[in-house]
Curated annotation (Swiss-Prot):
The gene is porB. Present in outer membrane vesicle formulations which are used as vaccines in human. This is Major outer membrane protein P.IB. Belongs to the Gram-negative porin family. The lineage of its organism: Bacteria, Pseudomonadati, Pseudomonadota, Betaproteobacteria, Neisseriales. It holds the Pfam family Porin_1.
Length: 331
């Protein structure tokens, strides 16, 4: 009897040790089709079509915490892409970190969402195509190898600061400073995210000496209704003496409402004409995405969406349309 009890106790020890470790993820895939048309001097110069089975951002992760006493906890997470097409490799290529959490807030180091990315609910679409999500305004969002502090919430208000070191260089990982705040009151919310970067290499031969971005999002979110409006301003000073100052303002809005198991949704984004040394350039754009989700259960949903994007106006423009259907399962 004693031997059986001891064996049972020993067998339970690994389970107890693993109790604070959570396996989670999302598998989502579908079929997308698109058609894009280039116009130059009023004439169609190129037409491109594409249809394919695509992964819509599948992921798998492990996270956990350990109670260190006196209200202090060690927290960690390892998350990676998990494409059903088998095109992803490596560990920790999504948000992955280790840190401490307590009454002071949360301090983490690793590959972390930028403060700007955490205001990204303005773009709620599951898509591979840039035409099926408001991805142009979302393009500056990134995950950075960085250190980040998030404050506790006081009367609905919380804040975050983040720093990415210069030696973690890359397209999105030049030396950068990030800050933001969140305010919640009932279903209403206001979010701000901003960043300042130095010596930012966008691509080969295009270097930015100073870059800053600011985004303000406001809206309402409860169990059924989601509505938000975002304004974003980017400003960059290039290292090249010619055309050294560039800026653009963008706006976006999203509206969704849940009817039983169905949630229809619509998003609109607009990019105003950018400036190069205070002169207008024709990089304005308009984008519309409409779609819906049908929940078979709390974990499994069907997705359908259609999108339209136009860059430029008049005789010189680019117009794209797209459609997609998919299936998503969370675990």
């Amino acid at each position: 009897m004693k031997k059986s009890l001891i064996a049972l106790t020993l067998a339970a020890l690994p389970v107890a040790a693993m109790a604070d470790v959570t396996l989670y993820g999302t598998i989502k895939a579908g079929v997308e089709t698109s058609r894009s048309v280039f116009h130059q001097n009023g004439q169609v110069t190129e037409v491109t079509t594409a249809t394919g089975i695509v992964d819509l951002g599948s992921k798998i992760g492990f996270k956990g915490q350990e109670d260190l006493g006196n209200g202090l906890k060690a927290i960690w997470q390892v998350e990676q892409k998990a494409s059903i097409a088998g095109t992803d490799s490596g560990w920790g290529n999504r948000q992955s970190f280790i840190g401490l959490k307590g009454g002071f807030g949360k301090l983490r180091v690793g590959r972390l969402n930028s403060v700007l990315k955490d205001t990204g609910d303005i773009n709620p679409w599951d898509s591979k195509s840039d035409y099926l999500g408001v991805n142009k305004i979302a393009e500056p969002e990134a995950r950075l190898i960085s250190v980040r502090y998030d404050s506790p919430e006081f009367a609905g208000l919380s804040g975050s600061v983040q720093y990415a070191l210069n030696d973690n260089a890359g397209r999105h990982n030049s030396e950068s400073y990030h800050a933001g705040f969140n305010y919640k009151n009932g279903g209403f919310f206001v979010q701000y995210g901003g960043a300042y970067k130095r010596h930012h290499q966008v691509q080969e031969g295009l270097n930015i000496e100073k870059y800053q971005i600011h985004r303000l999002v406001s809206g309402y979110d409860n169990d059924a209704l989601y509505a938000s409006v975002a304004v974003q301003q980017q400003d960059a000073k290039l290292t090249d003496a010619s055309n050294s100052h560039n800026s653009q303002t963008e706006v976006a809005a999203t509206l969704a409402y849940r009817f039983g198991n169905v949630t229809p949704r619509v998003s609109y984004a607009h990019g105003f004409k950018g400036l190069v040394d205070d002169a207008d350039i024709g990089n304005e754009y308009d984008q519309v995405v409409v779609g819906a989700e049908y929940d078979f259960s709390k974990r499994t949903s069907a997705l359908v969406s259609a999108g339209w994007l136009q860059e430029g106006k008049g005789e010189n423009k680019f117009v794209a349309t797209a459609g997609g259907v998919g299936l998503r399962h969370k675990f």
